[in-house]
């Protein structure tokens, strides 16, 4: 099954997708926030184009599992997404996905400008990979 991964941010949101078999994740695009309506129009356009079976969203938590302001912002984003799409939504705890993606890109020799263009997509890839590594019976969509 194909999934779409999201690394949500208040300025930039990274999007990644899996192959049709749901085995490998690939960076897809970065959506730059302008207005909420424009953001969701672009996101839903990608969803329509990719036709995933579900959407996987990274949920940033502190090391001890505590929630932060960005955690609440992600939860609000997920609530708005669920009002606009009937696809199942999965949350995956993520720590440092953007930081680690940035480090990987720096080590690969990308300039700051090049890293800025793709770091959120790479973070979305990491989120999808975390999801794909879960046993099938632990991939539980949000209810309600």
From Swiss-Prot:
EC number(s) stated in the UniProt entry for this protein: 3.1.-.-
Keyword Isomerase on entry: no
Pfam family, one: RuvX
Protein's cellular compartments: Cytoplasm
Keyword line: Cytoplasm, Hydrolase, Nuclease, Ribosome biogenesis
Main location, first listed in the record: cytoplasm
Gene3D superfamilies assigned to the protein according to its UniProt record, in alphabetical order: YqgF/RNase H-like domain
GO CC aspect terms: cytosol
GO biological-process terms attached to the record: rRNA 5'-end processing
GO molecular function, one term: nuclease activity
Top-level lineage group: Bacteria
Entries under PANTHER family matching the protein: POLYNUCLEOTIDYL TRANSFERASE, RIBONUCLEASE H-LIKE SUPERFAMILY PROTEIN (PTHR33317:SF4)
The family this protein is said to belong to: Belongs to the YqgF nuclease family.
NCBIfam families: RNAse_H_YqgF
Function: Could be a nuclease involved in processing of the 5'-end of pre-16S rRNA.
Protein name: Putative pre-16S rRNA nuclease
Source taxonomy: Bacteria, Pseudomonadati, Thermodesulfobacteriota, Desulfovibrionia, Desulfovibrionales
